[in-house]
Amino acid sequence: MTLALNPIAFSIGDIHVRWYGIIIACGILLATFMSIREGQRRQIMSDDFIDLLLWGVPIGFIGARIYYVIFEWGYFSQHPDEIIAIWNGGIAIYGGLIAGAIVLLVFCYRRFLPPFLVLDIVAPGVMAAQVLGRWGNFMNQEAHGAKCSLQYLQNLHLPQFIIDQMYINGSYYKPTFLYESFFNLIGLIIILSLRHKKHLFKQGEVFMLYLAWYSVVRFFVEGMRTDSLYIFGVIRVSQALSLLLLIAVVILFVYRRVKVKPKWYLEGSGLKYPYER
């Protein structure tokens, strides 16, 4: 007999606080802390990252919801009252990343900050939040793969609590949440190990490495998931977007190295710190 973990952390009256929300909040705080710490080294003030957080997080969630609704329009067109019911689930990371990137670019333009440098600074924190955030999916028993045997999970040498949590409605499922979290953790370690090496990254290239790594990981993990969003009924949206992003990163990297010749990442913003508005 298996015993699944309770997705509800605690309740206050009729209000239920889920582990998913707590884990996502911890991921946001971790990303903010990492960005502020690295930003100070690159002559970007902490106030800027706090302000970016206040704009980026809510708009990012809206973008994640809009993305999900668009690709599930067949359902939501019949249930328009559920479009805003985000508490019932249904957000997509790529939608949040796209919305967040737009907010960041506009923010940098308004604050006269170098956008590629800011993207470099926040990328590792975002990746850390993604590593952590997938465990929210674990608590909800979602974002899993196809059915599998108990022996399959045991052969992965997983802790028993993970095996138990992958037992859903009478069947075991592949823990694709864990695959994505693990390989993103590897990518995060690589980025954090390399980003401070001299004459390795131009500004914008830490972000590009993050985007390329995540695109490859997501492409393969998405192929194993059972809850993918589709276009034309046959193409997995996240796989298509991952491939497009990977191609775009390669083109942008070559173009900027050959034509633009940006500053080195370690040179920072060049702003006198702390600077005045």
UniProtKB/Swiss-Prot annotation:
Pfam families: LGT. InterPro entries: Lgt. It is found in: Cell membrane. One of its GO terms (biological process) is lipoprotein biosynthetic process. This is Phosphatidylglycerol--prolipoprotein diacylglyceryl transferase. GO terms for molecular function: phosphatidylglycerol-prolipoprotein diacylglyceryl transferase activity. The chain crosses the membrane at residues 15-35, 50-70, 89-109, 112-132, 174-194, 204-224, 234-254. Pathway: Protein modification; lipoprotein biosynthesis (diacylglyceryl transfer). The gene is lgt. The keyword Hydrolase does not apply. Belongs to the Lgt family. Catalyzes the transfer of the diacylglyceryl group from phosphatidylglycerol to the sulfhydryl group of the N-terminal cysteine of a prolipoprotein, the first step in the formation of mature lipoproteins. It is an enzyme of class 2 (transferase). It comes from the Bacteria.
